[in-house]
Amino acid sequence: MYLCHHVSSRKEEPLALATTLPRPGLEAHREAITLAFPELVSRLTGYIGRKLTAYVAGVKDVRSVDGWIKGNSPYGDAEERLRLAFQVVRTLIDHDSPRVVQAWLTGVNPELGDRIPLRLLREGDLNLVGPEVMGAARAFIAGG
């Protein structure tokens, strides 16, 4: 018996790995820069609560947070800090529960030299601590 092996003349397309592999934080980044501030604050408080949102913004009580949700303008660098905090939280929330994310934000973190992520986001130079905290969040996701 003679077997004939058919060879296709069609070229196989290369796999587009860059578009098919998950990229943790990409959607979070997009939302952090495009959401209207009241919506961003509302979502952030839904994830981590009003007190932690107020803390990272550097305000003493939640009345400011409530005002921002209603459309009041933030002052100082509160908006920048909250947008970065949202990006971090949104990246983590895709992989864990709000309770775990809150614990991650408020606990000492070995990836950050045993510093607390939320405190860095509140007090640090965002150009320096932003990449550090995002890197620690990605490391947490990768570590499972």
What do these predicted regions represent?
Residues 1-144:
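Non-transmembrane "mature" sequence context
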